[in-house]
Amino acid sequence: MDTVFQFTMPTKIVFEDGAAFHAGDQVEGESVLVISDPFLYQSGVARKIGEGLGGRRVAYFSEIEPNPSCESVDAAAHAARDAGAQCVIGLGGGSSLDVAKVVACLVSNPGSIYDYYGGGTKQLEHREAQLICIPTTAGTGSEVTNVGVFTNRNTGKKVPMLSPLFWPDIALVDSTLTHTLPAAVTASTGMDAFCHAIEAYWNRESQPMCDMLAMRAMKLILENIKTAYDHPQDAQARRNMSLASMLAGIAFSQTRTTGIHAVSFPLTVEFGLSHGEACSITLPAFIRISEEKKQKKMRELCGWLGFADVPALAQAVEDLMRSMNMRTRLHEAGVREEDIEQIVQVGLEAAIIQLTPAEMNRQTVTALLRSIL
């Protein structure tokens, strides 16, 4: 094989039911900040994690919103500095985990996220605080990536931020935390994981290691997501979905994502879709055009997943989404014909769109979106 690639994955993974409640076995230092959303704090989950930290000093920041803003990052960083945090634990979906990555850096790097993000001129120099990520959904894979995505309220745009300092030291993947997910969240985060996997697989920067992980992740999701949706206490289905999400996260951490995620940013910011919904609503349409530059590879994937061809795979994915009451047409999310031009414009501004295995320009993206309006 003449393929040349690099693969970097420095995060220690602990994949075990119950591991989250023994996080103290992994923590270094005596002062810990646990970052979560309000629900995980109010329901007692965050405090239960804190109680398993072996008597260390624990502070909590529980104000993380979906699609977190830079202001939330700065507020959490202020809490971490006040606590003298030697360890930052991100607990939750991708929003909390992404915030934890930046906060762990801002403990020892002065200023605001705005100094380092977007138009900021500073570089994150080092990270002294330990970073542990504990996912409570099976979807984002953020526990094994070095990227965070944040909403800049000044511009109204949602933009990724990457740094080698964002790799978590430890990912504690405990599928029992997903047993109480609402059905809609199980569906949207699970299909987000499928997007991660297929975007890594068909990516113009794909590589053999990622292909292997992505293929396994896709098969696990197709075999388990409906069971997890219909029977939320099915431990094996939940475990398989957590595994799939993690594998997909590792895969796209190396390749980045493609057009699905590029177009999702304006759908989230302007139309209020969750990240998983914003990605999955265009998934079948992107599958249908994936043969343009990856015909042989996509046919191999269809064989692995048990489908005759790419159209059959696209239809099966759309049918699966419908069976979980997910939207598959843009008008169902409030998008009108006159909105498409702006969605296309923002999507094309994301560099990752050019990693899609098809020509991505104003005409082709407009046609794709109109096909699912």
Swiss-Prot record:
Reactions accelerated catalytically: 2-hydroxyethane-1-sulfonate + NAD(+) = sulfoacetaldehyde + NADH + H(+)
EC number: 1.1.1.433
One Pfam family linked to the record: Fe-ADH
CDD domains referenced in this protein's UniProt entry, alphabetically: Fe-ADH-like
Keywords: Carbohydrate metabolism, NAD, Oxidoreductase
SUPFAM superfamilies found in the cross-reference section: Dehydroquinate synthase-like
A GO molecular-function descriptor: metal ion binding
Source domain of life: Bacteria
Family affiliation: Belongs to the iron-containing alcohol dehydrogenase family.
Biological function: Part of the sulfo-TK pathway, a D-sulfoquinovose degradation pathway that produces 2-hydroxyethane-1-sulfonate (isethionate). Catalyzes the NADH-dependent reduction of sulfoacetaldehyde (SA) to 2-hydroxyethane-1-sulfonate (isethionate). Can also catalyze the reverse reaction, the formation of SA from isethionate in the presence of NAD(+).
Protein name, UniProt field: Sulfoacetaldehyde reductase
